[in-house]
Regions:
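Membrane-embedded helix-loop-helix hairpins and adjacent transmembrane boundary segments
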Residues: 1-484
């Protein structure tokens, strides 16, 4: 059953998104094509930086998967979600300044540019590019599934139709607007998410008959829902440590977060970004997860936990308002996909194609065409991948997240802070981290009860230090030639 009152605000929202992308295309006159298309000519201020980092970091799993888990495991999961609070501070604090200064010095546009300038190894860049593409395709498929599920539940649009509407609109606006469109949309989407979260939470508390009544109802359903350990006693110390490493500390190693650290304007922007970003993450994480947990008092018998937020929207808000705030999780999903789509197309063009054919760097018309075409083709592949979705998407997302962290975290952090780090060390760290994570995650091996990310990062660090012994010191990093 398609609901027009819900669909109309959504159409209006998509039009705003396209409007911002057209504006971004018009602005695209300054600087060279690569710098502008993939980095917005490094011109982000504090508020925009905070919003784009937050919107990129907060994805379908925070708006759909996370509240779904809170619905299933109770208030303990809300507490667990707050572990993510320092994520913005960690990524901007540890990478931020140093990363941006070096990126400007090397004239780097992508993360792999930074890795090449630092370690000067082609093999390392190829390995990094391939692992990035594989993991991103996994992560973006999750976002596509999330978007289509949302339209299916809240607006009554069939899953396949929703998937097509969703996929086509994202691929188009990312392909033509580039990084500037992505960042402008993130800022607008961050605002929508904030307002949407607060209104929805108020609506749920009201529908449950007040906060204390909601908690009593949860206790009646299952006393474990209001205990710190959560239902099924899932929140053990090892689980919480693993979760913190995966979604907070490890975020430093996520390529689409790291590239946001290259593209801001000045150090005032970073300081402001850290403060605003942390506040926004706090409100969104607490609000959405609490909404999911308390939602069980309003709708106790959902079979697919991932559907909790869209179902609640339709239940506790009037249809028109539901349409407006359906835009909030849509925003979360879109902002994450466009960051990852851009990163993937940047990887294919800059790190693979221009490495093989460096003479093409001056051919801006061809690069423009290729960027758009590659983004659209990736969009089409993702549509195919998302056609038959699994039941709970949070695990699929965490799988892709962990793979990226296992490969990129140490080469990035040690490359910035350890002068003697060399290519042999970075390569051994990447290979050990990536392979170990893939094996542990595929066969669901949890050593001492830890998530695969914990042993993978520890052994990857060890492999880095040992491998470093056998490598040559890296010569002084060079400027990347001809605005590559």
């Amino acid at each position: 059953m398609m609901q027009l009152e819900v669909i109309l605000p959504l159409i209006a929202y998509l039009l705003v998104v396209f409007g911002l992308s057209v504006y971004a295309m018009r602005k695209r006159t300054t600087g060279t094509f690569l710098n502008e298309y993939f980095l917005g000519s490094r011109s982000m201020g504090g508020v925009v930086l905070a919003m784009t980092l937050t919107a990129t970091y907060i994805s379908a799993s925070s708006f759909i998967g996370g509240p779904g888990a809170a619905y299933k495991y109770g208030l303990g999961w809300v507490l667990l979600a707050m572990i993510q609070l320092p994520a913005v501070w960690l990524s901007l604090g540890i990478l931020g300044k140093k990363f941006a200064i070096l990126a400007r010095r090397y004239n780097a546009v992508t993360l792999n540019d930074m890795l090449f300038a630092r370690y000067q190894s082609r093999l390392l860049v190829w390995l990094a590019s391939l692992s990035l593409l594989v993991a991103f395709i996994g992560a973006m498929t999750v976002q596509f599934i999330g978007g289509a599920r949302l339209l299916e539940t809240a607006a009554g649009i069939p899953y396949e139709t929703g998937l097509i509407i969703f996929g086509v609109s994202i691929a188009l606006y990312t392909a033509f607007g580039g990084f500037r469109a992505s960042v402008l949309n993130d800022t607008m989407q961050g605002m929508v998410m904030l307002i949407g979260t607060i209104v929805l939470l108020v609506g749920i508390v009201h529908a449950a008959g007040g906060l204390s009544h909601a908690v009593e109802t949860l206790e009646a359903i299952d006393p474990k829902l209001v205990s710190p350990q959560g239902a099924d006693n899932i929140l053990s110390p090892t689980f919480m440590t693993s979760f913190w490493v995966l979604v907070c500390f490890g975020v430093i190693g996520l390529p689409h977060t790291a590239v946001r650290c290259i593209s801001y304007k000045d150090s005032k922007a970073v300081h402001r970004g850290i403060i605003i970003g942390t506040i926004v993450v706090a409100i969104l994480m607490f609000g959405m997860h609490l909404a999911g947990a308390l939602g069980r008092a309003v709708i106790p018998d959902l079979t697919v936990p991932d559907l909790v937020i869209p179902t609640l929207m339709v239940k506790v808000l009037p249809p028109f308002a539901a349409g407006i705030f359906l835009a909030a999780p849509m925003a979360a999903i879109m902002s994450t996909i466009n960051a990852q789509l851009l990163q993937s197309s940047a990887t294919i063009i800059k790190d693979l194609y221009l490495n093989l054919r460096p003479e093409q760097v001056e051919n801006e018309r061809r690069l423009k065409r290729m960027s758009a075409v590659i983004t659209l083709v990736l969009g089409a592949l993702l549509l195919l991948a998302a056609w038959r979705p699994p039941e709970m998407i949070i695990w699929l997302n965490l799988l892709a997240f962990g793979g990226l962290e296992a490969v990129f975290l140490w080469p990035l952090v040690l490359g910035l802070y350890w002068e003697r780090a060399n290519a042999a060390g970075a390569l051994s760290g990447m290979i050990v981290g990536g392979v170990l994570y893939a094996v542990l995650a595929t066969f669901k091996i949890q050593y001492l009860g830890f998530h695969p990310i914990v042993p993978s990062l520890l052994l990857s660090l060890l492999a880095f230090v040992v491998g470093n012994r056998f490598g040559q010191p890296v010569p002084q990093p060079a400027m990347i030639s001809s605005d590559k």
